[in-house]
Amino acid sequence: MTKLSIGTWLSLPNESIAEIFANAGYEWIVIDLEHSSIGINQAEQLIRVIDLAGSKPFVRLSGHDPSQIKRVLDAGAKGILAPMIETVHQTESIISACQYPPDGTRGMGLARAQGYGENSAKNKYINQKVNEIEIYVQIESKKGLKNCKEIFSNNINGYFIGPYDLSASLNNPGKFDTDEFYNAEKIILSAAKEEGIKCGYHLVEPDKDKINELNDKGYNMIAFSVDIRMLDVTARLPFNLK
């Protein structure tokens, strides 16, 4: 069993839910811009709430757009998760968009992350905090699986398997107990461990008994479920009485 970091996933633009999750003790919370209606204004409010409640606000991007990366980082996100990464070039572009010149291509602005321009906060962020931004990629396809070793050789913090998209790419959508899926997991885990990066898994269904099982496989970052599934499962409890 490896040391485990547990976070969760937020897809509803509701600050109270974000605060409840942070107060519950999740180490990090991923604000999902890919499969939700959350916009940049709402994302900034969620980032603020999560941050002030003592959890790390991460953002899953809707794609690979450098301008979106710039905006969520300026809003104060502590890390980003890039979906459907399949090539080294995509990874390098994501990393570059997170860093200021000369290390990258990110434009410099004065927003929440930079203390709204106050000199000491701005300088601290530019000189120190920007280097603490965590960068994660999602491996969700056969092409990403094929190139994962090269992808992981870049300067990233870790990866997350996108179980639904990966299983669909393996021609078994939503099935995570096939030989093909298990073999894909092994290949990705092995490549990540070689590079010394974190191994993440999004456990979509809120089944706490699966956490230790995933940890035993080698995953050390687990996103436990998502707000809509937690709400749906809990809402149905009175009607599932035996």
Residue ranges and their predicted role:
Residues 46, 50, 88-104, 173, ...:
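C-terminal helical cap(s) of enzyme catalytic domains, especially alpha/beta-barrels
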Residues 67, 82-155:
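Conserved anion-binding
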Residues 8, 21, 32, 72, ...:
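Conserved, mostly hydrophobic/aromatic
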Residues 9-10, 29-38, 57-63, 79-87, ...:
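Catalytic beta/alpha-barrel core
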Residues 24-28, 74-79, 99-100, 153-158, ...:
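Glycine-enriched alpha-helix->loop->beta-strand junction motifs that scaffold or abut catalytic
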Residues 79-93, 106, 159-170, 219-236:
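Glycine-rich phosphate-binding active-site loops on the catalytic face of alpha/beta enzymes
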Residues 40-74, 96-103, 126-131, 177-200:
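Alpha-helix-loop-beta-strand connector modules within alpha/beta enzyme cores
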Residues 1-65, 96, 135, 152-157, ...:
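Conserved N-terminal beta1-alpha1 strand-loop-helix module at the mouth
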